[in-house]
Amino acid sequence: MSEQKTSGSGSAAAARLQIEAEYKDKGPQWHRFYKEICETCDREAKEKQFSTSESERHTNRGLNRYRDVNPYDHSRIVLKRGSVDYINANLVQLERAERQYILTQGPLVDTVGHFWLMVWEQKSRAVLMLNKLMEKKQIKCHLYWPNEMGADKALKLPHVKLTVELVRLETYQNFVRRWFKLTDLETQQSREVMQFHYTTWPDFGIPSSPNAFLKFLQQVRDSGCLSRDVGPAVVHCSAGIGRSGTFCLVDCCLVLIDKYGECNVSKVLCELRSYRMGLIQTADQLDFSYQAIIEGIKKLHDPTFLDAEEPLISNDTETHTLDELPPPLPPRVQSLNLPLAPNSGGILSLNMRAAQANGAESIGKELSKDALNNFINQHDMIHDAEVADSRPLPPLPVRAFNDSDSDEDYLLDDDDEDDTDEDEEYETINEHDADPVNGHVPATTQPHADDVNANNEKPAVPVDEQHKANGIDPIPGQLPASPENELKRRKRNEYQASLEQKVNDMKRKQRENEDKQLAAKKRRSLLTYIAAGVVVGVICAYAYTKLG
């Protein structure tokens, strides 16, 4: 389709009618339409011989969150500082829309330093986060920013020579906006970096309405972080292709409609996919993209919509509850690598064997640290559930998670079996990546062949060495479990005990109700017998008087 420069609301209205017609026409066969787009993009990638060899290198596999989501070599971001130049990220561009983004995965515990180094080197002005840290009780992204304001609370990344300080925070109904001071320790230069954290993308699905998403897009645009005169904005979810691709597709198409009065949505998607594989993971995400584009043509030119201010909920120091954070990683990481004895595979092997001995399925070797952490914690949850009281009441809660249907909890998502998630597609492609508890784990990387012995046991590697190799230096003399993590553990145990007490109270009340019902039944039976006796007595007395 040709795209000649036009102007005026009439062209935008015509574009809206054209996209609406295509949307309605493809509606009955939407999944086939999505599949055809994917096949076209895959065919073009093969014809152009797009490779992913860097992501498959022996030394880089452990830096990928998902095994099936690898950056193309021709568009990957190359880190300049340090011994590691690889990060799972691509520069995605659409020249005629004057848009460029960096699409990347949610940082792992060992890639936080790489992530911020990329932000610094690429001169990015903003980070757009479209997921929660945990969803469906699975870690989707490591917490990569400081929790509290102040220089003394800054995140220190000495190996990549950067510090990250939280300087401002604003919480809105549908997103959180954070301002960071990113400082280069080599030059002592500092730069302000904004983070737009979209917090109400529903559990494993798509937003019910594009309005909140469009308001978020407007706020991002108004900040100027998408302009060509600044570095590309960093966009991520968990895999960096589903929700991230949705954001980029909607933004690019709306820009093209403003500039040219027309847009071929499927063509734009294929162009974006030529920079990073798999953008828009599901047919539902493509469906939502069309809805957002159609609605955005109208809303982003409506003064009422544009002038409406997003309600500010708070601008206080950020605090997280136990439910909002993943299980503390440092104690787990230490336990995974401390050897039990010479030539031993360490506590990880012991935990894995114990889990398998108790009936849990074995898990594949292609696991990231987050996935391993999920596996061990979930096995602990199973064990706790097995010892719960067997009465026909709800079992003891095994984890302090929020089970409401609200999307407002922006760091922890709840469980929804009926929806499909952008990352679920990649977690369930390979059967040997299945989670032994919930049926899926965000499986990612294969350990190196020379790191696994004949018993499939991974030799111990000091945590300090792991962090130094991946952009994070540990604090000298730091204990495996910090006071903060110990406090979290105690609070979690106290909360667990409180929940257990509540369930026991429920059981006690049920027993009391059962006893009351039984007593009432006995009373009713006794009254029935007494009434029957009285009736019989009256009849006998009446008969006696008549006969007498």
Swiss-Prot record:
Its keywords, alphabetically, are: Cytoplasm, Hydrolase, Membrane, Nucleus, Phosphoprotein, Protein phosphatase, Transmembrane, Transmembrane helix
* InterPro entries, per database record: NR_tyrosine_phosphatase, Prot-tyrosine_phosphatase-like, PTP_cat, Tyr_Pase_AS, Tyr_Pase_cat, Tyr_Pase_dom
Renumbered to this chain, motif PXXP motif (SH3-binding) 2 spans 339-342
Task: Motif PXXP motif (SH3-binding) 1: list the residue ranges.
Answer: 327-330
Tell me which residues bind substrate.
Answer: 203, 237-243, 281
A GO term, aspect molecular function: non-membrane spanning protein tyrosine phosphatase activity
Q: Which family does it belong to?
A: Belongs to the protein-tyrosine phosphatase family. Non-receptor class 1 subfamily.
**SUPFAM superfamilies recorded for this chain?**
(Phosphotyrosine protein) phosphatases II
Q: What is the effect of changing residue 237 to S?
A: Abolishes phosphatase activity
Q: What is known of its domains?
A: Contains 5 Potential PXXP motifs that may mediate interaction with the SH3 domains of dock/dreadlocks.
Source gene? Ptp61F
List the protein's name: Tyrosine-protein phosphatase non-receptor type 61F
